[in-house]
Amino acid sequence: MKSVEWFTWGVFLLLSGFGEAGRMGLGFQEKNPVFVKEKQSPFYAVPSNYEEVEFSSIVEPMYSGIATFGRLENVECLSKRSEDFDIAFIGMPFDTGTSYRPGARFGPSSLREGSRRINTKYGAVNVPLEINPFKSWAKLVDCGDIPVTTYDILKAMDQLESAYFQLIARKPSSFTDHDGFAKNDTVLPRVLSLGGDHTIVLPILRALHRVYGQPISVIHFDSHLDTWAPGLIGDGDEADGINHGSYFYFASQEGIMSKDANIHAGIRTPISSFSDYDDDVDCGFKIIEAREIDDLGIDGIVKKIRDRVGDNLVYLSIDIDVLDPAFAPATGTPETGGWSSREMRAILRGLQGLKFVGADLVEVAPAYDVAEITSLAGAQLLFDIVSMMVKYPLVKEADLSRYMPIHK
């Protein structure tokens, strides 16, 4: 015990009793003197050679800042209806229609976070599609999120339809002197929706039908059919029947999508009975199961999709659970045996040139993610979609050469 006390006193004397010599011996150095500039703030002192940093010349790191998709300009599109654009991203933070794991209401913010490395400042050339959509003829914006209730599904459907209609029923920034495919040969802007659960497609199709005036073909990437008749979940009334597994049934009943030119791809879910397939046929769908890629390959999958929709106007809907959970674990109803993110991107690129009127990516529930891999996969798919939309404007007989310096 005595030895410990003597050691403690020795250290104390070394640090304090020997003063300057002791401190210097232990490696302590005096700081350089600090001078206060004349008329400098009295609250702190600065070195005499201090210079202000010019932050306007510094490129913000890709991991910082407020996230928009691809660092696009955030525009209040719904409150400022005079704002024009060619392609907009809009968040739909709604997941009241989920039947299993909730959390897709946080999908829009997660997808924006996943797009940080795809941005206007650091470069965004889509090499396989040979285009940079952020440096082209198109004005791209991020319109933020639609304010939507989570307590009343019927009211939410009305809110989402109204907001989507307001976005697309305006003049675009470009091609205003061309003919388009909407009513009166009008060219309209296009919207990429960030879900949210898959129920959001019903109000989207309703709004699209109002402006295009014709049923639209649907390409639906998913592990589930989503054509359930009301009553499979819930009590069967409208408020209970509309959900992320039945919205296509309602769209078909309302006549707002094609009766014979829709297609699912990536299907692999168990079904309640074989009558589910009868309901699916009644909704105008054909099915490509996920396992078919083993025999058909990517080119075969692409051919079946293109043959089905033909030259129709097409709405593209992607449920992130079309991917295998190894590539996208953060979703509400994961199913094993899905496609890889590489396979999905290759299939998607095979659809370039189709007449896409809009698209969505849904069912990302980031609470279940690992290392952001689901958000990254979803953001990359959205990047491919917007690249195709820019590469192929939805106009009639346009001279694309003056708009597309690297278009092929």
UniProtKB/Swiss-Prot annotation:
It comes from the Eukaryota. The keyword Magnesium does not apply. It catalyses: agmatine + H2O = urea + putrescine. Keywords: Hydrolase, Manganese, Metal-binding, Signal. Pfam families: Arginase. GO terms for biological process: putrescine biosynthetic process from arginine, via agmatine; urea metabolic process. PROSITE patterns: ARGINASE_1 (PS01053), ARGINASE_2 (PS51409). One of its GO terms (molecular function) is metal ion binding. Mn(2+) 1 binds at residues 198, 222, 226, 319. Its cofactor is Mn(2+). InterPro entries: Ureohydrolase, Ureohydrolase_dom_sf, Ureohydrolase_Mn_BS. Residues 1-21 form the signal peptide. Its EC number is 3.5.3.11. Mn(2+) 2 binds at residues 222, 224, 319, 321. Belongs to the arginase family. This is Putative agmatinase 3. It comes from Schizosaccharomyces pombe (strain 972 / ATCC 24843).
